[in-house]
């Protein structure tokens, strides 16, 4: 648990009146290196006041102060305050701790959880300046994004996630006691290997409470087992029409959510195993929006911590020393290393997101002729409503495709290359000029499209009347083959399915160009 040294703060009382007048005529807040609980509450109240003035809509905030070791523990358990046990979390903890102790990596200043109330963890090693930065960044930046963005509204339920994780931990622990740690661990291994293929991309998720989840689980166990028995029962001989009807492909349409299909239709899974598959699937679904909004989420949080703290400084509430430390940290976060630098690892999502939201504000307040040509509806509009509209209604791919401006492409010196396997050299196909703006923007948007980064694998067919084998089909994107670990992943699929699994890789014409098979290991 990561609750030692908790500082649960009461909701900040409403502060009436207009925003504080401009000008540094107010007494600045004390800014010692060491923080106190009272100072955290004071800074939090000031930041909350300014956030309300800007119209940020957030969940209630709960702050908890934790040690570096507890922060490492939070890393290992994907940032959740409660989780089921699995060896991979311990492995991640040991690796992170080792790198941290050797000075090979630093730790995040905070971890924030998309829940209601929104829980933010502050490291006790932080200075008071860094604690204030974390509060502005996490509690009002990320928090408002979690509450407002359409993907989070569609796919996550902040009110019930903690309850569901408590239920998941208790259920997995109960399964370990009844069926053995090794059996549960092997099942979780296979489910974790398929998490990225275990999400719904188009259907609306359900929002049951903890009590409803318990009742539904018992109903599911009885119903699903009956359905599976009906599906796999030995069928009597029938007429030719009946045989033809039953030999149609199952499922009738390809199924993208592999864990969902296994949960509902795997022939040999016991009810408790189906429930564990469901738990992993629900956790994967919870994190699905975050994988599509990293640039927007981090950019939004960085824009608002910068705006909120600068507003407090302009009001005279922050000292020069505070701002120097804050700006040093902020600059490091939004630093974009150039191509060719030893530390370059691609486009920094913090840098790109912060630059885009800042540029949107500039387009609204001080548009150039070029801005008016590219963004006629945005130029001269109210920047707050424009930024909130962008935050609420886009994900990384569409956000970049819609709002990346020529000016920002020039400032970041963006260009697009093509890496053709048939050619010996890379080709620069577009740069930041009149001829290349749209191609660069489209290329960067595609780079943040999940369908471009993750393989498209769907359930294609089940031999219901034959050997019960499962056939998966991979549709190649830009003729890219699957990675070398495909056989290992297939072993996990066959373990869950219980029978032979085949994977076909097809090209853009539907022709099978590669095929793999895996059989479940004998018990």
Where are these regions (language model features)?
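Non-catalytic terminal regions of proteins
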Residues: 118, 125, 129, 145, ...
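Short pre-active-site segment immediately N-terminal to the catalytic Zn-binding motif
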Residues: 118-134, 289-293
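Fold-level signature of zinc-dependent metallopeptidase catalytic domains
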Residues: 32-40, 122-125, 154-163, 244-248, ...
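Active-site His/Glu-centered metal-binding helix of metallohydrolases
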Residues: 135-144, 300
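Auxiliary, metal-adjacent structural segments of Zn-dependent hydrolase domains
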Residues: 3, 7-9, 13, 21-23, ...
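Post-HExxH zinc-binding segment in Zn-dependent metallohydrolases
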Residues: 145-208, 298, 302-316, 328-339
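Long, internal scaffold/assembly segments composed of regular secondary structure
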Residues: 246-345, 349-350, 354
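N-terminal accessory alpha/beta regions
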Residues: 83, 87-114, 165-223
């Amino acid at each position: 648990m990561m609750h030692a040294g908790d500082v649960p703060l009461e909701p900040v009382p409403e502060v009436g009146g207009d925003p504080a007048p401009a000008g540094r005529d107010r007494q600045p807040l004390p800014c010692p290196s060491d923080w106190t609980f009272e100072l955290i509450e004071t800074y939090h109240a000031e930041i909350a006041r300014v956030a309300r003035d800007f119209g940020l809509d957030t969940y209630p905030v709960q702050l908890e102060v934790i040690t570096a070791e507890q922060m490492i523990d939070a890393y290992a358990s994907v940032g959740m305050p409660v989780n089921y046990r699995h060896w991979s979390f311990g492995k991640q903890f040991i690796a992170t701790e080792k790198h941290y102790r050797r000075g090979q990596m630093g730790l995040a200043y905070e971890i924030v959880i998309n829940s209601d109330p929104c829980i933010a963890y502050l490291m006790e090693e932080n200075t008071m300046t860094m604690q204030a930065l974390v509060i502005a960044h996490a509690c009002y930046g990320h928090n408002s994004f979690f509450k407002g963005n359409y993907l989070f509204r569609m796919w996550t339920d902040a009110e019930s996630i903690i309850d569901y994780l408590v239920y998941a931990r208790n259920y997995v622990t109960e399964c370990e006691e009844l069926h053995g740690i090794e059996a549960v661990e092997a099942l979780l291994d296979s489910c974790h290997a398929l998490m990225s293929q275990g999400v719904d991309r188009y259907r609306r998720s359900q929002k049951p409470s903890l009590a409803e989840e318990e009742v539904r689980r018992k109903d599911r166990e009885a119903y699903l087992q009956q359905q599976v028995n009906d599906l796999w029962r030995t069928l009597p001989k029938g007429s030719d029409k009946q045989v033809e009807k039953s030999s149609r492909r199952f499922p009738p349409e390809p199924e993208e959510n592999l864990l969902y299909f296994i949960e509902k239709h795997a022939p040999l899974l016991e009810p408790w195993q189906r429930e564990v598959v469901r738990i992993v699937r629900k956790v994967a679904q919870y994190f699905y929006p975050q994988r599509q909004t990293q640039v927007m989420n981090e950019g939004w949080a960085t824009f608002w911590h910068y705006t909120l703290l600068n507003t407090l400084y302009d009001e005279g509430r922050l000292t020069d020393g505070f701002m120097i430390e804050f700006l040093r940290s902020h600059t490091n976060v939004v630093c974009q290393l150039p191509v060719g630098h030893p530390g370059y690892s691609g486009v920094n999502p913090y840098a790109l997101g912060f630059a885009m939201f800042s540029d949107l504000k500039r387009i609204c307040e001080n548009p150039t002729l070029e801005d008016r040509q590219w963004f006629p509806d945005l130029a001269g509009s109210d920047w707050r409503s424009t930024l909130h509209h962008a935050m609420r209604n886009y994900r990384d791919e569409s956000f970049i495709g819609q709002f990346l401006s020529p000016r920002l492409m020039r400032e970041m010196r963006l260009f697009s290359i093509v890496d053709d396997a048939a050619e010996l050299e890379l080709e620069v196909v577009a740069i930041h000029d009149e001829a290349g703006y749209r191609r660069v923007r489209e290329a960067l948007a595609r780079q943040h499209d999940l369908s471009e980064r993750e393989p498209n694998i769907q359930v294609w067919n089940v031999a219901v009347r034959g050997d019960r084998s499962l056939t998966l089909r991979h549709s190649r994107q830009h003729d890219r083959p699957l990675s070398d670990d495909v056989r290992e992943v297939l072993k996990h699929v066959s373990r869950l399915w219980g029978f032979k699994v085949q994977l076909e890789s097809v090209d853009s014409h539907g022709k099978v160009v590669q095929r793999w098979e895996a059989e479940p290991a004998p018990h």
